[in-house]
Amino acid sequence: MSTATLSQETKQIVKATVPILAEHGEAITKHFYKRMFSHHPELLNIFNQTHQKQGRQPQALANSIYAAAEHIDNLEAILPVVSRIAHKHRSLNIKPEQYPIVGENLLAAMREVLGDAASDDVLEAWREAYELIADVFIQVEKKMYEEASQAPGGWREFRSFVVEKKQRESATITSFYLKPEDGKALASYKPGQYITVKVTIPGHEHTHMRQYSLSDAPEKGYYRITVKREEGDGDLPPGIVSNYLHQHIHEGDVLEITAPAGDFTLQEEGERPIVFISGGVGITPLMSMFNTLMQRGVKREVIFIHAAINGFYHAMHDHLAQTASQQENVHYAVCYERPTPGDRMNPFMKKEGFIDESFLRSILHDREADFYFCGPVPFMKTIAQILKDWDVPEQQVHYEFFGPAGTLASS
């Protein structure tokens, strides 16, 4: 943490704004992004505009600001949040000189949205608080940049990778196997981590960057990402980058990526059973963890539970089914929302509909386990609530958000 400190008066003013942030936080952050992109359009090359339109990015930022204000007396309490965001920043190649731009526009947004409630004293207190928090991020990210670049096979910023193989996994999911274009060493990674892919799409003014989980075990001589083609739904447009990768990136093409990042990683120590619960393309980081355990010959009980619309959309089923058939310590169960007649013949399909508490209870004979889950947010909220009701200790519960971090608290 930074050695800088805030005066007691500044802390009191910041804490006094907590109710205001609870009420107006998203309005402030939406205005902030609009203002910042207007004054600094070059930052559109970094931020995911789909998440902006969905409101997920402003909501995530509002939650972070609220948490910082609430814990201004003890910023150590939000270090896990800082670490998670810093991993994302390092992956996106965020630079220290961009923090003052964010601070300037955030304070201006507070003033313009809150009006008289944003007095000079309030804005000055938040300026001091922001500078302290920004310094924490800059120091944490500096260390992350150094670790990524100094690791064997590591690098800083972006590196060119060739698509060695492109493999269809389901109706909407495809894997890309990537190797360094320069033929040099490839950095290892922790199972569960992700990389950022940067693409320049013809006809688009700005570059696009997206994070994709590495979906295979490390030390295989390649990185594998497994990408769902986002088709769009209602007001949500089709995914710009996912459709570009599916339709226009082929074997032999080159992608620019950053070194692996992320703190959703496999904790290999211990003897408890490991339970993986995935929904849709949320299977990808869990497959990296699962394959790592299999590669290392771990004897702990491993239970893999996956939910999909049906077999048509289910990626990597054959691999999981074969492994479960061959390994006594591996158990595999599938839940299909709308199974086909063929799906009903699948011996691993155990439920039709959605994963619920009774289904998990029927599969898991021992709740004293380490749980890892990833998938759509409503799916994750369901799993989180079940584990909370079961009194599973927090240190045994691990999950990953795709996109801006949110909250799994029941609404």
Curated annotation (Swiss-Prot):
GO terms for molecular function: FAD binding; heme binding; metal ion binding; nitric oxide dioxygenase NAD(P)H activity; oxygen binding; oxygen carrier activity. Gene3D superfamilies: Globins, Nucleotide-binding domain of ferredoxin-NADP reductase (FNR) module, Translation factors. Its EC number is 1.14.12.17. Residues 153-411 are annotated as: Reductase. Residues 156-267 form the FAD-binding FR-type domain. Residues 5-142 form the Globin domain. CDD domains: flavohem_like_fad_nad_binding, Yhb1-globin-like. Disulfide bonds: none annotated. The record marks 88, 400 as: Influences the redox potential of the prosthetic heme and FAD groups. FAD binds at residues 194, 210-213, 401-404. The record marks 33 as: Involved in heme-bound ligand stabilization and O-O bond activation. It holds the Pfam family NAD_binding_1. Heme b binds at residue 89. GO terms for biological process: cellular response to nitrosative stress; nitric oxide catabolic process; response to toxic substance. It comes from the Bacteria. Its cofactor is heme b; FAD. SUPFAM superfamilies: Ferredoxin reductase-like, C-terminal NADP-linked domain, Globin-like, Riboflavin synthase domain-like. It catalyses: 2 nitric oxide + NADPH + 2 O2 = 2 nitrate + NADP(+) + H(+); 2 nitric oxide + NADH + 2 O2 = 2 nitrate + NAD(+) + H(+). PROSITE patterns: FAD_FR (PS51384), GLOBIN (PS01033). PANTHER family: FLAVOHEMOPROTEIN (PTHR43396:SF3). Consists of two distinct domains; an N-terminal heme-containing oxygen-binding domain and a C-terminal reductase domain with binding sites for FAD and NAD(P)H. Is involved in NO detoxification in an aerobic process, termed nitric oxide dioxygenase (NOD) reaction that utilizes O(2) and NAD(P)H to convert NO to nitrate, which protects the bacterium from various noxious nitrogen compounds. Therefore, plays a central role in the inducible response to nitrosative stress. This is Flavohemoprotein. It comes from Halalkalibacterium halodurans (strain ATCC BAA-125 / DSM 18197 / FERM 7344 / JCM 9153 / C-125).
